[in-house]
Amino acid sequence: MAIRVGILTSGGDCPGLNATLRGVAKALYHRMGDKVEIVGIMNGYDGLINGNFREMSPDEFSGILTVGGTILGTKRTPFKKMRVVEEDKVDKVAAMKKNYRAAKLDCLLCLGGNVTHKTANLLSQEGLNIIGLPKTIDNDIYGTDVTFGFHTAVDIATEVIDRIHTTAGSHSRVMCIEIMGNKAGWLTLYSGIAGGADIILLPELPYDIKKVAAAVENRAKAGKNFSILAVAEGAFSTEEAKMKRKEWTAKRAEAGYTTATARIAKQVEEMTGAETRICVPGHMQRGGSPSAYDRVLATQFGSYAAGLVADEHYGVTVAMVNRHVTANPLADIAGKTRGVPGDCDMLNVARAMGISLG
């Protein structure tokens, strides 16, 4: 009798999702042949709740190694609403368990970020056989040194910074580039260093706007006619750090600032007299073909997950720890975020290069 493996992709998309799906599938088919059946669950947990399943064939996993996005579709389904019965009267947790069993699944693989893993842990606690795979361009999943999608996003954000240099220099401007990362600054830190940013602002290190302005002025005094700021979308000031989140978000709204980057650009212009511009690459950082690094990582993670399925090792998520692929208990990582620590080597590199961290 064939083992039936469900698989879904949930949350925001990123490069490497399809490569990971392929890694799982090819390894399972190679190991088990016709003794495994893969069931695709469309649009993440929404598909699990509503029974939107698709029987997959081996051919559907061919030719997708280099393809961005996800062949299964994805959708954000907030964890905080999982146990909330809304107007549709659907008990989401009960529906997911019912549809899992109706499809006669032996296990379910959940590809996603922090919220996806919280729900994966919930389902594991509810008695389902769950395996997680860590996906996010933010690189902020606890317990793993790297997530697939991160390095491709670094490449994309770095190219943006590279290209901004020439226009910044030509027009003698201060360019503020908003990089994705609401709670963790890994993407901004790595792309900022790789792209030669002069100032890098992260959520983990509240910035002093006076120091930011001083860094711009010091470059001007040194004969540099432009400055590049790499700003994480979740960056906030030392003044805001003293307030509750609702308070400082309200103050930003009252002042007409939709983002931290807009506020910083305006303040720098007022304090230095330098002409400033904002660049927001946005969802470009999540799109397109995965890098060679992410293709390899996705294949590693996918093949390892297939081994976990074969060994019936559930209630875990795949991780890279000290360059070795392993598995962490879902209960140990769910609800935790891996931010840039204060003793991070890359912060020391930035400081050694004279990059201002605000």
Where are these regions (language model features)?
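Accessory alpha-helical/coil subdomains and C-terminal extensions
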Residues: 99, 110-112, 120-122, 150-171, ...
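Short, hydrophobic alpha-helical segments
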Residues: 165, 220, 306-313
